């Protein structure tokens, strides 16, 4: 059989019919993929899906026959496709599924090594009182009169959370948890909704989750990539309710993140989470949340503070507090903080309020003293050159007067700089201690003006396995 006949035979078997000329031209370079899909052991796949059903969807009334029918329907879907774009999307998604499901989700139901529940036992009550005082001093804006469009949570979240707990244990090298669930592991008084994760293969994982939900429940979920959040993908159900989301980061970034293990799951070091929390308070909507979520924010902040005090040996009775001078250029959207008091590997930090300006500088600087891109962990790059650190501050900037930074933003900018130091384990001791102590004596000042953050451009991209749509 000559090469053309071999290719035609593979395409014919895949489509269940002879290809038309356009289909042949498009699919002739895809024959290796098509062969893998054709030869995929769907009986073993059905067995893995069924085990996932009994492990993570126990209360769902669905028969084996229904699951088998959905699997068969999807793996013959190409026979009913008439548009080349849809056909290519089916090939891409089927290939991803057959090559990744077993090692991504299939392994979650295999026998695992025993693990022993572990926790760090700390008394958070004292720090919760301090957190109350901090939030009171941060309560400097009026409640918003605008009705906020909070995302509605899908009923699928309960099932996905069960999957995520096991996934975090089995894939601890490539997936790490942060947010309310990670704090719940430290302090059982903290409630959580979905499980927030950073991982190195978010797209593959989320597509597999979408297929698992489709085959077991029959429900259609959609993956949406949001342009203004770096490498962020969210899953919505058929009613646009939130199922789960994930940030994707490089393995090199994952390896740098300070982390702790609890119950065989890695969580982002709570000190990193504390610094990001302080940083996010420079967002006006986060300050508005203090009115409606005071107790929830207090217990989370108190937990982060107590862990950081314990783990990083912060002396609360020291009289040393944050001492930074600054210059602000509102017109050019730049802020300079002077860290001369601290023994850092630079003297001042140059904060760009527009990310493109930082990227331009990095591109035209071939040689630096230090450079690191921490992706979604800090939402910025850091470059050090000639005793100056350059970085991008992604939040709004709050002013207390026409030309004075608000204390909340000074703390936020300092936290952003400290993220570099704590993650790279360089020179953070004095600055971290001073910041924590300064939180306890923040001057309560009204917000005079808000400098907006930069606007991100781009298009939402979507993956819809039901409609055979893949937009990269």
Swiss-Prot record:
It catalyses: RNA(n) + ATP = RNA(n)-3'-adenine ribonucleotide + diphosphate. It holds the Pfam family Pox_polyA_pol. Gene3D superfamilies: Poxvirus poly(A) polymerase, N domain, Poxvirus poly(A) polymerase, nucleotidyltransferase domain. CDD domains: polyA_pol_Pox. One of its GO terms (molecular function) is poly(A) RNA polymerase activity. The active site is at residues 194, 196. Transmembrane segments: none annotated. GO terms for biological process: mRNA processing. Keywords: ATP-binding, mRNA processing, Nucleotide-binding, Transcription, Transferase. SUPFAM superfamilies: Poly(A) polymerase catalytic subunit-like. Its EC number is 2.7.7.19. Disulfide bonds: none annotated. Belongs to the poxviridae poly(A) polymerase catalytic subunit family. Heterodimer of a large (catalytic) subunit and a small (regulatory) subunit. Polymerase that creates the 3'-poly(A) tail of mRNA's. This is Poly(A) polymerase catalytic subunit. It comes from Canarypox virus (CNPV).
């Amino acid at each position: 059989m000559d090469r053309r006949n071999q290719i035609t035979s593979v395409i014919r078997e895949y489509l269940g019919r002879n290809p038309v000329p356009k289909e042949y031209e498009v699919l002739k370079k895809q024959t290796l993929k098509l062969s893998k899909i054709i030869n995929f052991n769907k009986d073993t796949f059905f067995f893995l899906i069924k085990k996932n059903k009994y492990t993570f969807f126990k209360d769902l009334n669905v028969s084996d026959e229904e699951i088998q029918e959905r699997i068969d329907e999807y793996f013959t879907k190409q026979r009913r496709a008439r548009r080349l774009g849809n056909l290519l999307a089916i090939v891409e998604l089927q290939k991803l599924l057959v090559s990744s499901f077993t090692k991504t989700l299939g392994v979650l139901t295999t026998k695992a090594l025993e693990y022993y529940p572990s926790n760090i036992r700390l008394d958070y009550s004292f720090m919760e009182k301090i957190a109350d005082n901090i939030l009171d001093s941060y309560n400097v804006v009026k409640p918003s009169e605008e009705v906020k469009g909070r995302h509605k949570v899908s009923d699928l979240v309960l099932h996905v959370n069960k999957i995520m707990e096991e996934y975090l244990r089995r894939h601890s090298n490539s997936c790490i948890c942060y947010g309310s669930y990670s704090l719940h592991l430290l302090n059982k008084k903290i409630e959580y909704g979905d499980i927030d994760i950073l991982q190195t293969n978010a797209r593959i994982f989320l597509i597999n989750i979408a297929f698992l939900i489709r085959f077991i429940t029959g429900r259609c979920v959609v993956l949406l990539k949001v342009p203004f959040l770096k490498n962020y993908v969210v899953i919505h159900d058929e009613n646009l309710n939130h199922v789960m989301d994930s940030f994707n980061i490089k393995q090199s970034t994952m390896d740098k993140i300070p982390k702790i293990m609890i119950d065989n799951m890695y969580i982002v070091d709570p000190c990193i989470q504390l610094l990001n929390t302080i940083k996010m308070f420079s967002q006006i909507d986060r300050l508005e949340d203090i009115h409606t979520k005071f107790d929830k924010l207090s217990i989370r902040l108190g937990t982060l503070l107590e862990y950081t005090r314990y783990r990083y040996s912060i002396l609360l009775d020291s009289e040393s507090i944050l001492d930074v001078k600054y210059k602000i250029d509102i017109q050019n959207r730049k802020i300079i903080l002077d860290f001369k008091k601290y023994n850092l590997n630079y003297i001042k930090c140059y904060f760009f309020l527009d990310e493109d300006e930082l990227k331009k500088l990095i591109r035209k600087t071939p040689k630096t003293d230090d450079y690191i891109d921490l992706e979604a962990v800090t939402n910025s790059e850091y470059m050090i050159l000639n005793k100056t650190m350059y970085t991008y501050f992604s939040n709004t900037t709050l002013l207390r007067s026409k030309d004075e930074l608000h204390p909340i933003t000074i703390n936020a900018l300092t936290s952003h700089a400290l993220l570099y130091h704590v993650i790279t384990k360089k020179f953070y001791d004095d600055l971290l201690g001073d910041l924590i102590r300064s939180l306890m004596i923040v001057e309560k000042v009204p917000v005079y003006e808000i400098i907006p953050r930069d606007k991100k451009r781009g298009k939402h991209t979507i993956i819809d396995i039901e409609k055979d749509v893949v937009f990269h």
